[in-house]
Amino acid sequence: MKRKEDHLVTVNPEILGGTPVFTGTRVPIKFFFDYIETGETLDEFLFNFPTVKKDQAFQLLEFAKELIIQQIPDENVA
């Protein structure tokens, strides 16, 4: 069974040496988080990387959120 992230992220040694990229692009996932981390907006990222669709960026954020929530033990939740 395919996981949701399998349609979102591609890791292929033939594409940027296996760097995780948005599926259907050559845009590394790391670039997205670097943009957000430096205070750039989602729209600025999408403008500079037009092969990434807005829906892909939102799905990546949702996936990252789910991973973080899964990693936090229940006893640490206030």
Please describe what each predicted stretch is:
Residues R3-D43:
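A short, structured beta-strand/loop element
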Residues P28-A78:
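Long, charge-rich, low-complexity alpha-helical segments
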